[in-house]
């Protein structure tokens, strides 16, 4: 997403072998020399030393201005990924990434002093595979010389608010692996580079540090925060990004770029800009060299005052710039020469081509003591009424599809690793996890899962995910056939959330295979739409298990099919097969819902199991009380739906609510309804209260046996806007808890941060938007507590949330807006015009503050990696001859401890797998069960289908061996950091500290799958 650059029409292409000369797209453009011409002119390539040895020379007693030529190439925004790459639909935005890379390489070859940085590997890898071998060698030399430098190196520049940490790690691993495979250590980025995301999370910084980055630069931060930092000279500092990991494990040097990511005003020399080129001929009436040089010196000097060293940076580029790189570099060449010539006249400014890594290297050599930051950079505002907190909730359906796809990708990865080649080549065809892996990586882009692209681009993101599911379904089918010992016609019912599954709805008998991707046993309630009748369900051992067929009320005009319910017991990292058969009877035994009339004299309505009771107000139909019966905790809780009237920019500010910006017209939201029509469903397997608030808003409050949480399944949409009011819909929980203005949210699904209403930890806040300015990203959970009781709400996707008054907690579930917010999309968030109907769920936990983490940590793990249901008609042919059919399987020989999460199990190549194990509790989170204590594992015989023959530990993204990895060291004002303990690796003795993730590459030998 761009700050300034908007486009109109450029096209260029270079020679490939004998493909011909460069073609001109504009009559006045000078011809760019073809790449093949430079093959004879390359300087002899010397081996690039690991790190910073190729950086340019600076002047120690001058202000060194590091020019950073770069382009920011959104992986989808106003155009789709393919449209951006190929330069299609330039009437929407002029941008063609393939031409940018062609042009940059030619321009770099024209002058050995020039440098350039590139970021988005989704684009670069595509361009790379279209090049000749000769061009690839040219590029390798440029990388080796440090003149083409990769920053960040992920598949995309991911969003930091709406992304789950597991998906962040995956997309960074994908991009960095491409660089490692293509360029070796020469291509490894030293610097993380997030110049456009709209706020920055603490967990993102922690992950970057664990990935091995030396530093981190970003462009956007709150306008009040930036002003304070400039005055205090804290535009650069060390970010201590974890309260559990021992420093400097999660410490990351962090710098705020002075101009966002754009050039200084009047110094943009791209075809997309209108600034005047530098004219140095004094005979020309357009001569401006002296004026521009003086202007540059003033800008550099003024900018340097806000930074602590004699070094400062200028980002020379912006959105999709450098399609005519010669235009940029020709003017920069002149600028460098003319500015440095002023040194003979007493100037103390030295300007040079540089890179983020080389700038960071100079800061490190300055050997200063730096301040430390402990919180994060949310929420972000670029003006008094312009809080970028709307995108936390924009496009909720796409956000959910992304989270479901992450779940499915992990299942796909795990079975590929457990089965080996038989998963890729089998009776169902060629299975492949790569398409979904790449699609998921694209979805992490800061205009994708954020919901801030145009509608046709959001549709294309969904298309990419759907295309990735297909090859993974083939892979799963091959793997299940191999592990079960026979093949069948497997069916993946992707619309179970709306009770659609043709096989279960038409077949008199079928099989249900349920795969559990967690490293511990799970009991899971299976719900399948069926025809009316009675069904018998049998477990893997042929024993009948309790089941129910329930008819549910419908909140719309469409009939809701009956649903079959049964509880499946699932082994760790494995599956169980259940057989379902319809039993003919004269009278169906389906249980129908009971409508509950609204009578003031009616007794309170309750649903309960052995752990929890929920009570509903008979007058309003609303939830009014939750009781934890194990702890004897009783909390009045009133939950219902409200909506904020979205600003259209017609009051004290012209800022409207839009895809990015949340700005309600008033602080007090309006109720969707003050009461709900309710129906009650009670069976031995489920108890539900169905609440209908309006034609477009309903909810089911649900309890299963043994469940320690309350499930609230909400359905919202299409949001009506016929009254010309845009609406931003929230689910709000009101309690009497005395929370003292504090509430707590997760950071990308991992560590928890305290939030305080109308407060920022590092500056005195002038709060100008009391609602939007208190919203924070909620990736998996939000909670409030009075120190004794804690109410926690878990989400099934990323949402915005807050506590706007003591004891209250709210989450934004959907938004539909009539105005654009002026941040570049130029399209209101209408969701296909008619609006989207969205279903989701919140999981509610009530516990003591001391015991709450044990509940929400394990439940959040299960919500993100839920079991995968696969159906088959049964009666398939034997496949793995010599092995008896198998109805149950576990990929582990023993369950992982509850505090350990199997974050990644994926194929890494022939006879090698990638393994990540994570301690999912923070220091001091759970004293009762000691779940925050270090845990030691034996990996030697942990897996059942393969033996680990060799184990190597790596950094988080598997591009450096841990024993060889080192990062730049920084001195902080908090004193020295502890010395790192000597590194040792014993596969039989792997210890995980709280919040630690350990990553391994394991050489494996697969075993014959038998019974």
Curated annotation (Swiss-Prot):
Keywords: Disease variant, Disulfide bond, Glycoprotein, Glycosidase, Hydrolase, Lysosome, Metal-binding, Signal, Zinc, Zymogen. Its cofactor is Zn(2+). Changing residue 356 to R: In MANSA; type I. Residues 1-49 form the signal peptide. Its main location: other. Changing residue 159 to N: In MANSA; results in less than 20% of wild-type enzyme activity. Changing residue 318 to L: In MANSA; reduced enzyme activity. It catalyses: Hydrolysis of terminal, non-reducing alpha-D-mannose residues in alpha-D-mannosides. It is an enzyme of class 3 (hydrolase). SMART domains: Alpha-mann_mid. Transmembrane segments: none annotated. Changing residue 379 to L: In MANSA; reduced enzyme activity. Changing residue 445 to Y: In MANSA; results in less than 20% of wild-type enzyme activity. Changing residue 197 to R: In MANSA; results in less than 20% of wild-type enzyme activity. Its EC number is 3.2.1.24. Belongs to the glycosyl hydrolase 38 family. Necessary for the catabolism of N-linked carbohydrates released during glycoprotein turnover. Cleaves all known types of alpha-mannosidic linkages. This is Lysosomal alpha-mannosidase. It comes from Homo sapiens (Human). The gene is MAN2B1.
């Amino acid at each position: 997403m761009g700050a300034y650059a908007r486009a109109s029409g450029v096209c260029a292409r270079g020679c490939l072998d004998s493909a011909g000369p460069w073609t001109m797209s504009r009559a006045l453009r000078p011809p760019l020399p073809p790449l093949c011409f430079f093959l004879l002119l390359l300087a002899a390539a010397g081996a690039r030393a690991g790190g910073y040895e190729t950086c340019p020379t600076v002047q120690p007693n001058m202000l060194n201005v590091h020019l950073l030529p770069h382009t920011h190439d959104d992986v989808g925004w106003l155009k789709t990924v393919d449209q951006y790459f190929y330069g299609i639909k330039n009437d929407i935005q002029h941008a063609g990434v393939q031409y940018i890379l062609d042009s940059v390489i030619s321009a770099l070859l024209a002058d050995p002093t020039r440098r350039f940085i590139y970021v988005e590997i989704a684009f670069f890898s595509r361009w790379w595979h279209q090049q000749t071998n000769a061009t690839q060698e040219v590029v390798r030399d440029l990388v080796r010389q440090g003149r083409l430098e990769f920053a960040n190196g992920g598949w995309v520049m991911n969003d930091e608010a709406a992304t789950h940490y597991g998906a962040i790690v995956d997309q960074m691993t994908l991009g960095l692996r491409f660089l490692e495979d293509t360029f070796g250590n020469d291509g490894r980025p030293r610097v993380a580079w997030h110049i456009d995301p709209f706020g920055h999370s603490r967990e993102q910084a922690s992950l970057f540090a664990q990935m091995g980055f030396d530093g981190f630069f970003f462009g956007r931060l709150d306008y009040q925060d930036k002003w304070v930092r400039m005055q205090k000279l804290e535009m650069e500092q060390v970010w201590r990004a974890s309260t559990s990991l021992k420093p400097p494990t999660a410490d990351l040097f962090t710098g705020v770029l002075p101009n966002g990511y754009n050039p200084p005003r009047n110094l943009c020399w791209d075809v997309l800009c209108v600034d005047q080129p530098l004219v140095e001929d004094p005979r020309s009436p357009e001569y401006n060299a002296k004026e521009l040089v003086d202007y540059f010196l003033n800008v550099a000097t003024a900018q340097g005052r806000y930074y602590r060293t004699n070094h400062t940076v200028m980002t020379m580029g912006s959105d999709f710039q450098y399609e005519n790189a010669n235009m940029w570099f020709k003017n920069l060449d002149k600028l460098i020469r003319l500015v440095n010539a002023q040194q003979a006249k007493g100037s103390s400014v030295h300007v040079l081509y540089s890179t983020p890594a080389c700038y960071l290297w100079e800061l490190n050599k300055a050997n200063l003591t730096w301040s430390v930051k402990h919180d994060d950079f949310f929420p972000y505002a670029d003006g008094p009424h312009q809080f970028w907190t709307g995108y936390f909730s924009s496009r909720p359906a796409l956000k959910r599809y992304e989270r479901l796809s992450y779940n499915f990708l992990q299942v796909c990865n795990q079975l590929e690793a457990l089965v080996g080649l038989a998963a890729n080549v089998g009776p169902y065809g060629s299975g492949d996890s790569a398409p979904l892996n790449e699609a998921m990586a694209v979805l992490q882009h800061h205009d994708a899962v954020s919901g801030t692209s145009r509608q046709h681009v959001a549709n294309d993101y969904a298309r990419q995910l759907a295309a990735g599911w297909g090859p993974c379904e083939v892979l799963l089918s091959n793997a299940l056939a191999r592990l079960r010992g026979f093949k069948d016609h497997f069916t993946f019912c992707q619309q179970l959330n709306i009770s659609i599954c043709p096989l279960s709805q038409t077949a008199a008998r079928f099989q249900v295979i349920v795969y559990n991707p967690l490293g511990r046993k799970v009991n899971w309630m299976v719900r399948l739409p069926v025809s009316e009748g009675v069904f018998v369900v049998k477990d893997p051992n042929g024993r009948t298990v309790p089941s129910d067929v329930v008819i549910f009320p419908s909140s719309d005009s469409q009939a809701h099919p009956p649903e079959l319910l049964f509880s499946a017991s699932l082994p760790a990292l494995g599956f169980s097969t259940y057989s379902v058969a319809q039993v003919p009877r004269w009278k169906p035994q389906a249980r129908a819902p009971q409508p509950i009339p609204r009578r003031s004299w009616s007794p309170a309505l309750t649903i309960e199991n052995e752990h929890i009771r929920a009570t509903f107000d008979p007058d309003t139909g609303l939830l009014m009380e939750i009781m934890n019966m194990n702890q004897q905790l009783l909390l009045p809780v009133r939950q219902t739906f409200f909506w904020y009237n979205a600003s259209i920019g017609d009051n004290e500010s012209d800022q409207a609510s839009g895809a990015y910006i949340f700005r309600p017209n008033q602080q007090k939201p309006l109720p969707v309804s003050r009461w709900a029509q309710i129906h009650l469903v009670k069976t031995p397997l489920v108890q539900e209260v169905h609440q209908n608030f309006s034609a477009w808003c309903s909810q089911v409050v649900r309890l299963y046996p043994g469940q320690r949480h309350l499930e609230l399944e909400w359905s919202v949409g299409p949001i009506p806007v016929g009254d010309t009011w845009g609406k931003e819909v929230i689910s709000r929980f009101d309690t009497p808890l005395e929370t003292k203005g504090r509430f707590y949210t997760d950071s990308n699904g991992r560590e928890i941060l305290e939030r305080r209403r109308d407060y920022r930890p590092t500056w005195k806040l002038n709060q100008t938007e009391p609602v939007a300015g208190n919203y924070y990203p909620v990736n998996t959970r939000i909670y409030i507590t009075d120190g004794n009781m804690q109410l926690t709400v878990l989400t099934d996707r990323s949402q915005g949330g807050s506590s706007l008054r003591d004891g209250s907690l709210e989450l934004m579930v959907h938004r539909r807006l009539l105005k654009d917010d002026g941040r570049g999309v130029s399209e209101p968030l209408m969701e296909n015009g008619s609006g989207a109907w969205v279903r989701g769920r919140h999981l509610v936990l009530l516990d003591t503050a001391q015991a709450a983490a044990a509940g929400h940590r394990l439940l959040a793990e299960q919500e993100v990696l839920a079991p995968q249901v696969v159906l088959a008609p049964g009666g398939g042919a034997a496949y793995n001859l010599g092995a008896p059919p198998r109805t149950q399987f576990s990929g582990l020989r023993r369950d992982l401890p509850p505090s350990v999460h199997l974050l990644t199990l994926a194929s890494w190549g022939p006879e090698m797998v990638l393994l990540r194990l994570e301690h999912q509790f923070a220091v001091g989170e759970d004293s009762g069960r000691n779940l925050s204590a270090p845990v030691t594992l034996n990996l030697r015989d942990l897996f059942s289908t393969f033996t680990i023959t060799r184990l190597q530990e790596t950094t988080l993204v598997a591009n450096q061996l841990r024993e060889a990895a080192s990062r730049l060291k920084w001195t902080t004002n908090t004193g020295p950091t502890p010395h790192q303990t000597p590194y040792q690796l014993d596969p039989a003795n792997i210890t995980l500290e709280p919040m630690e993730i350990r990553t391994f590459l394991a050489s494996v030998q697969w075993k014959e799958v038998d019974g």
